[in-house]
Amino acid sequence: MRRFLTGFLCVILALGMAFSAAAEPVRGAVRFSEDGQEQLGQPLAGLKIGIDPGHQTHANTEREAIAPDSSETKAKVASGTAGVNTRTPEYVVDLQVSLILRDILTAMGAEVKMTREENDVDISNIERAVMMNEWGADMVLRIHCNGSIDRSVKGAGMYVRKTGAMAEESAQLARCLLAAVGEYAGAQTQSVYKRDTYTGLNWSEVPCVLVELGYLSNAEEDALLNDAAYQEKLALALVWGMIDYVNTP
């Protein structure tokens, strides 16, 4: 956290520069003081944004329904992956990025709720979704890292529901997030994938995206995802994507 705090002002300044460089500045993002100095506004003021850092220290192999109307079940919380070289568990990286994201969103004026702020918890995927539904979130990001037996595979990807009331809104949010991660974090990107197999997405009653930040099974992305500066870039890019989403007609 100390490393993040030392770089936080730089992140905010970078966001301000990104806004000022845009051909059409995002509504409410930049304002000017009386002496003409550029200042950062709060473009996400009034929004309630949920963050669900994926996984937890210990998996929960008990079963729960993957959707409200389904008899199919999955483990309440899977174990997640780990860095191929760093051996850092996914749940650690998920939380690190989520905490940075929380702080930037708060600075942007959003009200933020996290499903967890520590790793040693036991919160099922249904419980995480219901928590956000009951809180009245305007949108939810589920922060994860990917893994593959093919260590050459890399790239950030977004997962949303294929069907359901929030499917298209979630897909629109996902497209904005994916574009921003590629442009502002410099990440290699994959695509927006539509699935009805993710419990946390199926139980969500608001626009919800499962964000796969990259592949911990890939040596290059393992190193990046464990780098504090890159984590800040990813978090900042996700914020930019959310701002783009809320300003899209």
Identify the meaning behind each predicted range.
Residues 1-249:
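Catalytic-site microenvironment of enzymes
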